[in-house]
Regions:
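Active-site-adjacent structural elements in enzyme catalytic cores
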Residues: 1-168
């Protein structure tokens, strides 16, 4: 597979191409406020399987679902406790992951077979725009082979995952 290097920007063409890859079950690396994430449609088992394959990660290691807005969270989790609501109000969007009891909508492959799911809302314009346009939560661990350093640049992602993912 050829990996397409797209400039990490809010450019409509780049975002639309990334969304098309995601809708076709492919993987796309995208920037967040911390590191690059390796995104797949978090509700598509075949796409999620590709994350584990590309990273060489065991499938019993749960993934984080990234959302763009709170309406997405309500579909993924059974309840939002007062404590979780406090954290959401104070720290989202931002680099905080919160673990919730999941709904049946969340594939077991995403949760590593657990009855919980980890969710975060990134505070990065490109990440949020991509998730919003894709209109699905993105399962997105760091965009690197398991055991390697988490990438902070598109160049680092390309050096590690070129040929294993559709786009950066």
């Amino acid at each position: 597979m050829e990996t397409k290097l797209m400039i990490a920007s809010e450019d409509e063409n780049s975002l639309n191409q990334a969304v098309a890859f995601l809708k076709n079950g492919e993987l796309v690396a995208f920037p967040t406020e911390t590191v690059y994430g390796l995104g797949a449609d978090g509700l598509n088992n075949k796409a999620v399987e590709k994350i584990y394959q590309a990273k060489g990660r065991p499938s019993d290691n749960p993934l984080i679902l990234h959302i763009a807005e709170l309406a997405q969270l309500e579909l993924l989790v059974e309840t939002i406790s007062p404590e979780a609501q406090f954290l959401i109000n104070k720290y989202w969007p931002g680099p905080l992951t919160i673990v919730f009891k999941k709904t049946e909508l969340v594939p077991a492959l995403v949760s590593g077979g657990l009855d919980t799911v980890a969710v975060r809302m990134p505070d990065h314009k490109i990440a949020r725009a991509l998730i919003k346009l894709a209109n699905v939560p993105l399962a997105a661990p760091s965009a690197n082979t398991s055991g390697r350093p988490s990438p902070t640049t598109a160049k680092a992602v390309m050096a590690d995952l070129q040929g294993k993912i559709a786009g950066v």
